[in-house]
Amino acid sequence: MSPDVLKRKLSAIANYLQDLRRHEGITFDEFMAHHYEIERILELLIMNASDIIMHLLSSKGEAPPSTYRSSFLRAGELGIISIELSRNLSLSAGLRNILVHEYEEIDYSVLYRSIPSALRDFTMLIAELDK
């Protein structure tokens, strides 16, 4: 991934984080009034992060991982991102699958509680990759 593309994708993640921050600290009822918007922001955060990680793995000669989850974990193993962040982001991959594929009924209380960790983890991703 070229440095320009990486910067552009990290900038997109920063913009999505700004959008998500508007919902930080809202009540559950307020969340439910905007849950489709928040779901989409979370989906975009996860997909952009996955795209970055897949490209960075590929640039290191790694075969494409079969899942988003495994791509985040492999990035941690290779030192592309910290182990802590790789574990946290791997959990977000499961959330993405639920949102996109509706494998399970969405538990909105879990989604609501995921806002602070998403803000923390994707901010950390920018900090670790924007070197």
Short names for language-model regions:
Residues 1-131:
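Solvent-exposed interaction patches of small proteins and small membrane subunits
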